[in-house]
Structure formats: C-alpha cells, structure tokens
C-alpha cells in the first residue's frame, strides 16, 4: 500500500479472503445468524491467524484510504469465497454435508470474479457512507445457498453476478445431497 501511495496509484484492489470474517460461520451454521451482510458496519472477526491477517490488511487499507498519510489511496478489498469446483469428497464422514453446502454458498465462478474485479477497478466513485474511498465486497456468485450478502457490491459498483452454483452443478447437487445419506435441511434422512 505504501508503494502504491508513493507511486501515485489511484486505487488498489486487494484479494482479501472470506476468512477475514469466518468467526460468523459458526453462528451461521448453528442458525443463530441468517446471513452476513457485506456492509462496512459489520466488524470482521476471525478465529484464526490467516483470517486475522486478512482482516488487519483490510483495516490498514482504511488508514490509507482516509487520506491521513498525505492523500487518499482508494481501496477495494474482495473477500474471495470458493473459486473452485465442488468436491463430493467433502461429504465423506459428514452426515450434515456442511463443507459441501458451504462451498455451494461460497462459490465464485471465473466469469463473476472477473466482473467483480473489473468493476472494482473501473467504477468511478467508490466512496463509502463516510466519504472514504474504501469498500469490502464478498467475492461470490449469485448462489442460491449464499450466506454472505452482495448488496454492497451491487449498489456501489453495479456487480451483477451471472452464475449460481446450484445451477452450475445441479445434477451433482441433487445426487450428493439426496442419495448419500446427508441429513439436515437438504437431502434425506437415512
């Protein structure tokens, strides 16, 4: 960030991680929370060092965005979800199928991630509600099972994801969540 400031870079787009706020997943899994909105008023909380490092870098970005170091360095931090194919092996030994369902909610397609990055770079004004050019967006597709909000990215940069993991892997989802003894809100009870 310092070098970007010194070299007169206007904006940085940073690959953050969903782990910057992964503490909330425990609340989501236990249904104590419905969805984690992607707004600047939700404090990121992580319960591991990797997430803490990502969270700290987001906060450091805010310092640079405020202009207290000479000028405002615009910051967009993208908490990337799961940019990979679904893996049925995550169902092994997990009767609730949580890792599999989590990846359904966290999935981001290459097309949607590209759109999110490009719009984060090209959108003219990214000022937040305090007039600070600093934003945090979740990098996920428009997934049926998403548990992170996209409202902020939709509103600020016009993000319009085109993919949904539920549609992309419809056959696999049906097979894996209804025929492998997975219990819970999806699938059948053995």
Residue ranges of predicted features:
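Active-site helix of classical SDR
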Residues: 49, 53-56
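Alpha-helical substrate-binding/gating segment
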Residues: 69, 82-97, 107-133, 142
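Residue-level signal for the nucleotide or nucleotide-sugar donor/cofactor binding architecture
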Residues: 55, 105-112, 148
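Active-site loop of classical SDR/Rossmann-like NAD(P)-dependent oxidoreductases
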Residues: 140-150
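Amphipathic terminal alpha-helices
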Residues: 165-190
């Amino acid at each position: 960030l310092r070098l970007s400031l010194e070299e007169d870079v206007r904006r940085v787009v940073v690959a953050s991680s969903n782990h910057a706020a992964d503490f909330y997943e425990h609340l989501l899994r236990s249904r104590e929370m419905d969805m984690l909105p992607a707004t600047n008023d939700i404090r990121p909380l992580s319960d591991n060092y990797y997430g803490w490092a990502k969270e700290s870098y987001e906060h450091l970005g805010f310092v640079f965005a405020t202009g207290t170091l000479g000028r405002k360095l615009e910051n967009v931090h993208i908490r990337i979800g799961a940019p990979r194919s679904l893996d049925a092996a995550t169902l092994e030994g997990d009767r609730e199928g949580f890792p599999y369902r989590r990846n359904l909610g966290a999935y981001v397609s290459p097309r949607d991630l590209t759109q999110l990055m490009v719009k984060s770079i090209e959108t003219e004004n990214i000022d937040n509600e305090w007039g600070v050019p600093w934003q945090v967006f979740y990098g996920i597709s428009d997934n049926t099972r998403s548990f992170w909000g996209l409202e902020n990215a939709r509103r600020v940069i016009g993000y319009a994801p085109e993919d949904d993991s539920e549609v992309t892997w419809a056959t696999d989802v049906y097979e894996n969540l209804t025929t492998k003894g997975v219990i819970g809100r999806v699938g059948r009870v053995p």
